[in-house]
Amino acid sequence: MAKYIPKTGSRKNVRIGSRNHTRKIPKGIIHVQASFNNTIVTITDVRGRVISWSSAGTCGFKGTRRGTPFAAQTAAGNAIRTVSDQGMQRAEIMIKGPGLGRDAALRAIRRSGILLNFIRDVTPMPHNGCRSPKKRRV
């Protein structure tokens, strides 16, 4: 029986271009979404393309520990470490949500050495929109 010879230039096996394309990003936007259960930090460039992200869950915190301020601080530090290597110097911060990690994430970003243009709270507030769910009785 004839021996199978795999094609070396097949489209399946060859990656066109690199996956981790490092480009210089002088300015970016840091989005912090702090809920009661988790804190997600996403860093984008000015056009909105995601450069780096991290959350308390990806940093190894499980269960109720994800909502703690220390978990938010760790998540913010992990996200910023990757973009500071790419040369980010200036950033704008958008903070969303009522969680405990808001201030801790902001403190970690401040300590990183990135200059902040402004800090904006973009928490969605209804102007008497949909009816809220009933309160829990425990």
Curated annotation (Swiss-Prot):
Please give the GO cellular component terms listed in this UniProt entry. Answer: chloroplast; ribonucleoprotein complex; ribosome
| Molecular function (Gene Ontology), one example | rRNA binding
Tell me which Gene Ontology terms the entry assigns under biological process. Answer: translation
Task: Tell me yes or no: is rRNA-binding among this UniProt entry's keywords.
Answer: yes
Name the source's superkingdom: Eukaryota
The family database entries (PROSITE patterns) matched by this protein are listed as: RIBOSOMAL_S11
Q: What InterPro entries has UniProt attached to this entry?
A: Ribosomal_uS11 (IPR001971), Ribosomal_uS11_bac-type (IPR019981), Ribosomal_uS11_CS (IPR018102), Ribosomal_uS11_sf (IPR036967)
Query: Which Pfam families does the annotation name?
Result: Ribosomal_S11
What are the subcellular locations of this protein? Plastid, Chloroplast
Keyword Cell inner membrane among UniProt keywords: no
Q: Which UniProt keywords apply?
A: Chloroplast, Plastid, Ribonucleoprotein, Ribosomal protein, RNA-binding, rRNA-binding
List the Gene3D superfamilies: Ribosomal protein S11
Q: Spell out the family assignment given in the record's similarity comment.
A: Belongs to the universal ribosomal protein uS11 family.
- Partners and quaternary state? Part of the 30S ribosomal subunit.
Protein name per Swiss-Prot or TrEMBL: Small ribosomal subunit protein uS11c
